[in-house]
């Protein structure tokens, strides 16, 4: 986000591999030798500054135990497909485990990127929004088990309600509900009347509104 990079933080650090190394060293010094230290990074700042390998090596040399690589530059944000070759290059450049990240929304997609990059695993972010069952499907495919089917409508609504309830318990309703609006929208994907349901999501103010939303979902699905 611009407000992050404008302060020199976040993916802006991809422009300064040495600083990344010093930060990892400081974190390692604070944590001590026994606690795991992980790093999340992109492949570079832009097409002219593909510093992923240099950053990864600095992180490894200064005590990182694992690196997760999002396969785009900061300039690309989330628009083009991830650069599998760039992730692979970073994975080959270090001796610690590397996780592939970006555009992983299906179990087969996770399996494919692992085969393409040779990474030790995957990191899931946006792909799991509204679909917490993605991890179960990935685990099944990677272990040679039958892939579970799509969750029922009851399961989806129960998960939505439970997630927002836990958010309210942790953060308080005043803080949690504005954040819950976006989370709820992801659960509307593929449902009849999804557009109107997303508008309903955008107006959630209290936890009791979630039950009203779920009632509207069932009514529209018939």
Q: Locations of the language-model features?
A:
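Active-site beta-loop-alpha junctions enriched in small/polar residues
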Residues: 40-46, 72-74, 103-105, 127
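Flexible, glycine- and charge-enriched loops at secondary-structure boundaries
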Residues: 13-17, 80, 153
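Active-site entrance/lid segments in N-terminal catalytic domains of soluble metabolic enzymes
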Residues: 1-60
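Short beta-strand segments at enzyme active-site cores
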Residues: 34-42, 66-71, 100
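Short gly/pro/ser/thr-enriched loop/turn and capping motifs at secondary-structure boundaries
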Residues: 2, 75, 129-132
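Alpha/beta catalytic cores of nucleotide-metabolism and tRNA/nucleoside-modifying enzymes
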Residues: 22-25, 29-32, 51-66, 85, ...
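Active-site core of PLP-dependent enzymes with the aminotransferase class I/II
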Residues: 48-49, 79-81
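Catalytic beta/alpha-barrel core
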Residues: 15-16, 68-72, 77, 100-102
């Amino acid at each position: 986000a611009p407000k992050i990079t404008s302060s020199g933080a976040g993916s802006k650090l991809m422009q300064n591999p040495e600083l990344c190394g010093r930060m990892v060293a400081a974190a390692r010094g604070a944590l001590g030798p026994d606690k795991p230290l992980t790093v999340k990074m992109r492949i570079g700042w832009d097409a002219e500054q593909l510093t992923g390998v240099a950053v990864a090596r600095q992180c490894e040399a200064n005590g990182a135990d694992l690196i997760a690589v999002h396969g785009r530059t900061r300039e690309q944000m989330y628009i083009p497909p991830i650069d599998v070759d760039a992730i692979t290059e970073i994975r080959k450049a270090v001796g610690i485990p590397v996780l592939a990240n970006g555009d992983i929304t299906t179990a087969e997609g996770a399996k494919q990127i692992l085969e393409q990059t040779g990474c030790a695993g995957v990191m899931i972010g946006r792909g799991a929004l509204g679909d917490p069952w993605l991890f179960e499907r990935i685990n099944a495919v990677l272990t040679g088990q039958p892939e579970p089917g799509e969750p029922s409508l009851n399961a989806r609504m129960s998960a939505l309600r439970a997630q927002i309830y836990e958010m309210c318990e942790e953060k308080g309703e005043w803080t949690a509900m504005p954040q819950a609006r976006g989370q709820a929208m992801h659960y509307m994907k593929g449902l009849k009347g999804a557009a109107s349901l997303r508008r309903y999501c955008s107006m959630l103010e209290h936890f009791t509104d979630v039950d009203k939303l779920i009632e509207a979902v069932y009514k529209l699905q018939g």
